[in-house]
Each structure stands twice: as structure tokens, then as C-alpha cells.
């Protein structure tokens, strides 16, 4: 078994060289079974299937092979006969001969017409029983050999023998032989000619007999001694028949034979599978300069209102220590994949009705899932962890990242229960300036919904992307702004039960001190992805998996 380790390197070079062909695996399973796996590409999604079918048909039709096309067995007139001393009938013998795989030592050209044959080779087989006949017993011409010498042919008893001559041809595809059936018109012509010949012979014999009768003289009678001598010799012949005459008669009966044509299949490869595998080597990361973010890459955003001053300092100090330990936030530039929402699709981000849950299907259909996954993979590699196992899950879950406006770095966004207003408030009492609450991890769930906080703040209301009349261009602007600084803080948050959270937010004592959270949770149907970025050559169904401690 041979495995090529440089296959992945060859596949990754497709960004500089368009076309590639590589052998992934090649092995010999047994004498008549060979396995090979090749990669060819890249092609468009619609073109690959068409090309694979054409390639399969071309390979099967252009390959040449060797096959036995006819046999001649001593004492056999047709394929439904039987041989004395042989276990199998002639029909089973023919089937075993058709399964014999032959090969040529020299490579022959494929310059041949459809269903045509080349030079004919003649082979022989002469075996006496008792014996098991195999392919190694065949007497093949020079340059030809059996792929499997242990191929079974027949079994002979003690009194059995098999004398056979067979023809071998090289060709393409297959040949279906025509049976030797005599036409009815040919039989009628033969009968008519035979009757005329008999009548003519009888007439000439009658004329000759009449002529001979006029001129023929009678023979003299034998003497008594001659009659006795003839009687003794005739009696000896009846009691002990001539052995040579018997041998001649039996030899003439056994040597009767007739060539039997066989349906030959010349294809050395009987099965070719073309499997289409997707490999998104071109869509790893986008290099669009408009999507260049400076310094920070935050997967999620959490906003705050008025925190108690004594708890704020502890949390900010902890967040600053996390930022200093995070190598990702020390980088100067980070390139994000393109996340585009068409015009008019931003209305799906708003809540409708009283329920805090809303359908997120419209917004889900507009996202580039592969770009989101590549972003998560890039974050994972930057943090020095590898927790993402995309081929073992059936759901996708992520947070819609909101980059605040650079002109107001300490802006907090909140959403009311009815979904008609969104409160944005600047922090005044915390003593923290230029600080946004951000969450450096993926929040994951299988609930296909849009979840928002169920409270109303008595503060100034601003237009934001969560309102129904929001334009998608503004959301795209928010997603592409460079607004985060190196020393910004990350605030962790926890979700409470819906009823308990509602009570806390409506109470007078806790209203000014609670987090206002906007989370988006979506679910992706199974088998959305067909690419494994870690091992791109496994034909597996890929989706997102939970990234713990991201």
C-alpha cells in the first residue's frame, strides 16, 4: 500500500497554479484487483460532474485488453456437450475460460476502431486426468501471461482427458459472437441439389448396367477347396474382429470437433468511480481591503448600563489582564472574510410582537457560513487552541458581532420587549471612558431564534441596526468600522432565566446596575458544509462544533 504524503502540499498550490492532478493512493489488493485514487481539478461545481462522467466513459472505451475469442475442443461439437471424465460440462468450462485475465508484456497502442481486434494469438491445452486444471496449465504464446495462475478451469477424473485449442485476440470494449445458424433458404437449396444429384446418378447407373449386361461375361464357379478356404477365413473374422479396424473407427469418432465462438470482454478495468469532492482552497480568507480591521477581532458584544463603581473596577482589571494575555489583540492587522447582507434584509434583525423570540431564517440565509467558519478557525489558531471539530456536529451557532461607532466608543445598545425601540446610553457614573463590553468567546446553542433583553430603559433613544427600518448598508458599515482599541475591556456576562431576568430588570433597585445583552442564536441544518479545512480530502459532511474556552 502506497500513500503519497505530499498530496496536501500539491493541493494547496492551486492558488498559484490552476490545474493539478495527483495520485492519492495506489495499492494491489490481489492478483486481479488493483486500486488507485487520483485527484483532478479544480473545476466549477457544475462542470465537475459532467467532466467526471465523460472521463469515466472515455477510460472504459479507450483501454485495450486481451480475451479468449474462440475454442476448439476435441470430441465436442457445441457448447452444450459433455466430456467423459470431466466434472464440469462444456458450458461451465467456457465460463471459466472467459474469467481468465491475460496481459501483455509490451504496451500496445490504442489506435483501434470500436469493437475491433488486432493480431490473433493461438494457445493450447492438453491434460490427462486425474487432475485439477488451472490457468497455469495453459500453453500461451510468447509475450502473453496469466495474471492469476491459480485461476480454476476444470477437474478431470482418472479416465478423463482434455485437448483444446483456443484463440486470443486484443481489442477494445467487447465482441458478441454470432451463432452458426443455417438459413432456411440454404437448407432448401441443399436438398434440391442433393435430389437432382441422386436422380442423375441413378439414371447413369441404369444405362451403364444395361450396356454392361450385353457385353459382360459370367465368372466361373469356385471349386470345393476354394469354398472351404473362404468359409474358414470368414468364420475367423467373425470370432476375433480386427483390432486395428476398431481403433480406426473409434479414432474417427473421437476426433470430431467444431470451433465454438465466445463473447469476449476486452476491458481490463471494469469499474471506475468519479467522486466529486468540494475543496474551498480559494475561499480561506478574503483579501478585500475594505474589510481590513485594525488591532482587534471580537466575536461577540455585550453592552452595559450603569454598573456599581465598586464592582466595576474589579471587572475592568480582570478584563485588562485577559487582553494582555491574549496574543490575538496584540496583532496590528486582522483580515476578516466578507459578511454581506443585501439591501432590505436587515428587517429580520428586529423583534416582532411581545415574545422575546423571533425567527432568524431570513438573516441566516444571507450569511456566508464558510467565511464565518474560516474566521472562527483563524481565531482558534491565533489563540493557540484547536477546539473546533466541525465534522462531528450538526449545528452552527455564532454571535453577530457589532462594532460600535468610532465616534462613540462607550455606547451601549439595548433592545426592548416590543422590538420597536432600541436604547443606546453613554456611561456616565462608572468612571470608565472609551470602554465597550465585549465577549471573547462564541456563545453556542441549538435554538433557532433571536433573543433580546426584555426591559425598557428610561434613557435617550437612538436609531440602531435593530430597528425594523434599518438599512443593510448601515449594518455593513458597523461591521467594517475600525473602532476597538488595544486597551478596551471585555465584560463577561451570564444568561438568566427569562422570568427571573424580567423581575430583576423591572425592579427599582437593580435597573441601573444590570447588563443589557443582545445575543443571536441560530441553527444550521445538517450537511451544510462539505469541506474539512483540517483534512480537506475526506469526503465528510462538515458543520460547526462547540468551541470551548475560545
Swiss-Prot record:
Segments of this protein annotated with the region Alpha C-terminal domain (alpha-CTD): 378-550
Stretch forming the signal peptide: none
InterPro entries, alphabetized: DNA-dir_RNA_pol_insert, DNA-dir_RNA_pol_RpoA/D/Rpb3, RBP11-like, RNApol_insert_sf
Pfam families noted in UniProt: RNA_pol_A_bac
Assembly behavior: In plastids the minimal PEP RNA polymerase catalytic core is composed of four subunits: alpha, beta, beta', and beta''. When a (nuclear-encoded) sigma factor is associated with the core the holoenzyme is formed, which can initiate transcription.
Intracellular or extracellular location(s): Plastid, Chloroplast
Enzyme Commission (EC) number: 2.7.7.6
GO cellular component: chloroplast; DNA-directed RNA polymerase complex; mitochondrion
Keywords: Chloroplast, DNA-directed RNA polymerase, Nucleotidyltransferase, Plastid, Transcription, Transferase
Organism domain of life: Eukaryota
Domains (record comment): The N-terminal domain is essential for RNAP assembly and basal transcription, whereas the C-terminal domain is involved in interaction with transcriptional regulators and with upstream promoter elements.
Record region (Alpha N-terminal domain (alpha-NTD)): 1-333
This protein's name: DNA-directed RNA polymerase subunit alpha
Gene Ontology MF term list: DNA-directed RNA polymerase activity; protein dimerization activity
Amino acid at each position: 500500500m502506497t500513500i503519497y504524503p505530499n498530496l496536501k502540499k500539491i493541493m494547496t498550490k492551486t492558488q498559484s497554479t490552476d490545474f493539478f492532478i495527483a495520485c492519492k493512493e495506489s495499492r494491489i489488493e490481489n492478483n486481479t484487483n488493483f486500486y488507485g485514487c487520483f485527484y483532478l481539478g479544480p473545476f466549477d461545481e457544475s462542470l465537475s460532474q459532467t467532466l467526471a462522467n465523460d472521463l469515466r466513459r472515455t477510460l472504459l472505451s479507450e483501454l485495450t485488453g486481451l480475451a479468449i475469442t474462440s475454442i476448439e475442443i476435441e470430441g465436442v461439437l457445441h457448447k452444450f456437450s459433455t466430456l467423459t471424465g470431466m466434472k464440469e460440462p462444456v458450458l461451465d468450462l467456457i465460463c471459466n475460460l472467459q474469467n481468465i485475465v491475460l496481459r501483455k508484456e509490451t504496451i500496445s497502442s490504442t489506435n483501434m476502431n470500436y469493437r475491433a481486434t488486432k493480431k490473433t494469438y493461438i494457445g493450447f491445452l492438453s491434460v490427462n486426468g486425474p487432475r485439477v486444471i488451472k490457468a497455469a496449465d495453459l500453453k500461451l504464446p510468447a509475450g502473453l501471461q496469466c495474471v492469476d495462475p491459480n485461476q480454476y478451469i476444470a477437474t478431470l477424473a482418472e479416465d478423463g482427458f482434455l485437448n483444446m485449442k483456443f484463440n486470443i485476440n486484443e481489442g477494445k470494449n467487447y465482441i458478441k459472437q454470432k451463432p452458426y445458424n443455417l438459413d432456411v433458404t440454404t437448407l432448401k437449396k441443399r436438398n434440391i441439389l442433393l435430389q437432382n444429384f441422386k436422380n442423375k446418378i441413378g439414371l447413369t447407373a441404369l444405362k451403364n448396367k444395361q450396356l454392361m449386361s450385353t457385353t459382360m461375361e459370367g465368372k466361373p464357379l469356385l471349386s470345393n477347396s476354394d469354398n472351404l478356404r473362404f468359409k474358414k477365413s470368414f468364420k475367423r473374422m467373425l470370432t476375433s474382429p480386427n483390432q486395428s479396424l476398431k481403433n480406426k473407427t473409434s479414432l474417427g469418432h473421437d476426433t470430431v470437433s467444431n470451433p465454438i465462438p465466445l463473447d469476449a470482454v476486452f476491458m481490463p478495468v471494469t469499474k471506475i468511480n468519479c467522486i466529486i469532492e468540494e475543496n474551498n482552497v480559494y475561499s480561506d480568507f478574503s483579501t478585500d481591503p475594505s474589510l481590513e480591521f485594525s488591532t482587534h477581532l471580537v466575536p461577540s458584544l455585550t453592552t452595559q448600563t450603569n454598573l456599581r463603581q465598586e464592582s466595576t473596577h474589579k471587572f475592568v482589571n480582570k478584563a485588562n489582564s485577559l487582553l494582555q494575555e491574549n496574543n490575538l489583540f496584540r496583532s496590528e492587522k486582522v483580515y476578516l472574510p466578507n459578511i454581506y447582507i443585501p439591501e432590505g434584509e436587515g428587517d429580520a434583525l428586529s423583534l416582532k410582537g411581545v415574545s422575546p423570540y423571533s425567527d432568524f431564517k431570513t438573516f441566516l440565509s444571507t450569511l456566508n457560513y464558510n467565511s464565518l467558519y474560516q474566521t472562527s478557525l483563524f481565531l482558534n489558531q491565533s489563540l493557540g487552541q484547536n477546539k473546533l471539530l466541525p465534522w462531528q456536529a450538526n449545528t452552527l451557532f455564532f454571535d453577530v458581532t457589532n462594532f460600535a461607532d468610532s465616534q462613540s466608543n462607550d455606547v451601549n445598545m439595548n433592545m426592548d420587549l416590543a422590538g420597536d425601540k432600541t436604547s443606546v446610553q453613554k456611561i456616565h457614573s462608572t468612571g470608565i471612558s472609551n470602554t465597550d463590553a465585549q465577549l471573547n468567546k462564541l456563545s453556542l446553542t441549538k435554538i433557532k431564534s433571536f433573543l433580546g433583553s426584555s426591559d425598557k430603559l428610561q434613557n435617550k433613544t437612538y436609531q440602531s441596526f435593530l430597528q425594523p427600518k434599518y438599512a443593510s448598508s448601515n449594518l455593513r458599515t458597523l461591521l467594517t468600522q475600525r473602532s476597538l482599541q488595544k486597551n478596551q475591556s471585555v465584560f463577561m456576562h451570564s444568561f438568566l432565566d427569562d422570568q427571573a431576568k424580567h423581575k430583576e430588570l423591572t425592579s427599582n433597585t437593580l435597573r441601573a446596575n444590570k447588563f443589557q445583552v443582545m445575543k443571536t442564536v441560530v441553527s444550521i441544518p445538517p450537511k451544510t458544509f462539505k469541506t474539512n479545512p483540517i483534512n480537506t480530502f475526506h469526503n465528510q459532511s462538515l458543520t460547526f462544533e462547540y468551541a470551548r474556552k475560545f
